[in-house]
């Protein structure tokens, strides 16, 4: 989520770069009103894990072992600025997944197709006054509802996951950057046949946008995430998972209210997905 919010700052700024001198305060000054972030992403796991994409990449508790999963996810986020320092956030997402496996009895390759509403999140973002060359920001999000799968059981869970993140943002011509760290909490899930603990997440990362022209940026990012052990019925069935990712992309500012970005992320360990390709539309109202 941090990358989407950080790059969203550039919507409306890029067309002004040719004539306006930017400062740390003018760049991050927010106008009262509504912003929309629509993200379409294609994930290829290349491993046996299942993943959630929002608010951050994490491994779910489904113990089914797949050869590979190709997942197309649509995420819609609305951010309403009540005050230059205070934002409200609501985000919902759903996905289509092609889950590939080898038939145990015949040895043939096969797959399942699954359409699903995934989750609805509410959040708050508070932006502090600038300190030296940085603008501190803190965000908190809670899952209102999450629809999750354990083997063949689908079940809705309410208020079971929360995410807290602290960010330092800055600008040094021609780069807009963010450094962040956070914690993701997952409460125990009770399915019909099992009680599952997904494990909690700890992560740090950074993103930067290099302004190439008044309309185009080159976007880079890196993140290191650790997810604690998963337990089923109190028995540990995984070690701590390391999920490093690297990303590259570009943002094009259509006008002062609209921008489009393309991005690609690569995993750096066996617990990380092979690749994520994303298309994002930013809109101010």
What positions do the PLM features span?
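Outer-membrane beta-barrel biogenesis signature
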Residues: 17-52
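Detector for outer-membrane/organellar transmembrane beta-barrel domains
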Residues: 32-46, 153-230
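Surface-exposed strand-loop-strand hairpins of Gram-negative outer-membrane beta-barrel proteins
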Residues: 42-73, 110
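Outer membrane beta-barrel transmembrane domains
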Residues: 49-51, 55-60, 103, 195-285
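Residues that define the transmembrane beta-barrel architecture of outer-membrane proteins
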Residues: 68-74, 111-122, 156-164, 194-204, ...
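Residues on the lipid-exposed face of transmembrane beta-strands in outer-membrane beta-barrel proteins
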Residues: 76-80, 122-126, 164-172, 181-183, ...
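Repeated loop/turn-to-beta-strand initiation elements of outer-membrane beta-barrel proteins
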Residues: 85-90, 131-136, 174-179, 214-220, ...
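Outer-membrane pore/translocation modules
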Residues: 93-194
